[in-house]
């Protein structure tokens, strides 16, 4: 099983053109209802967009807000989300580094945020504090924000375990989507034969054998 600790530095850090990697072909059936969990609703697709709704809460067996040692005294509550994802994402030549805030959405309809807190930027490092280092995240990789909105700040561990080997490693379906429209995968989480760590660019992305760019979260055995 994967060790949770290596995910402390995971982020969608930039978008840029990369060389092809011929090791994998990801599943691009993003309009297939089986790509998503039962927590999303009103899934619809056209040639340009994937759209769906969610209430912002994961499966009921995900144990939320446990393992947090630096609580902000918030509690996850239902929200009304509507997501619209482009089906024709484009890569930027110049990389873009996100700041604290949302950077994507998971396939269970829960927002994915940058790993940083909204704390002040460290003048020496140029970075904000890490939510994981600050002890603000639960065992699933998320917490409730100031609006009682649950969201992930690192790889969504409980969601990936819920999706399982079949979807993640065999069918190679995404675990989420970045705000730029590119899918997020977890190849190598269960099966080291799918480990693409050495093939990723500085944005934690790569291009598959059919020309589809995707991001991948870090995993170790």
Give residue spans per PLM region.
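Extracellular/periplasmic catalytic domains that process cell-envelope and extracellular macromolecules
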Residues: 105, 143-147, 207-209
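Long, compositionally biased interface segments
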Residues: 198-221
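A structural motif
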Residues: 135-138
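Bacterial N-terminal signal peptides that target proteins for export
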Residues: 1-11
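Bacterial N-terminal signal peptides
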Residues: 10-19
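A mature extracytoplasmic/lumenal domain signature
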Residues: 89, 116-118, 154-158, 188-190, ...
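Solvent-exposed N-terminal domain segments of exported/luminal and surface proteins
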Residues: 24-133
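Short helix-loop boundary/capping segments
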Residues: 130-133, 147-196
């Amino acid at each position: 099983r994967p060790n949770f600790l290596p995910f402390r530095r995971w982020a969608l850090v930039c978008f840029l053109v990369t060389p092809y990697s011929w090791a994998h072909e990801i599943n691009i059936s993003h309009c297939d209802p089986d790509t998503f969990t039962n927590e999303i609703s009103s899934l619809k697709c056209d040639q340009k967009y994937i759209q769906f709704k969610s209430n912002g809460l994961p499966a009921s067996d995900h144990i939320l807000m446990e393992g947090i040692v630096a609580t902000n005294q918030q509690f996850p509550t239902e929200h009304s989300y509507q997501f619209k994802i482009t089906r024709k994402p484009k890569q930027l030549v110049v990389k873009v580094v996100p700041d604290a805030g949302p950077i994507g959405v998971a396939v269970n309809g829960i927002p994915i945020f940058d790993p940083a807190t909204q704390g002040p930027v460290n003048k020496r490092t140029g970075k904000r504090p890490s939510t994981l280092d600050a002890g603000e995240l639960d065992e699933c990789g998320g917490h409730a924000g100031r609006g009682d909105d649950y969201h992930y700040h690192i790889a969504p561990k409980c969601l990936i375990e819920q999706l399982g080997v079949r979807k993640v490693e065999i069918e190679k379906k995404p675990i989420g989507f970045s705000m730029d429209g590119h899918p997020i995968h977890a190849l190598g989480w269960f099966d080291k034969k799918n480990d693409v760590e050495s093939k990723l660019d500085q944005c934690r992305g790569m291009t598959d054998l059919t020309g589809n760019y995707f991001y991948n979260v870090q995993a170790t055995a």
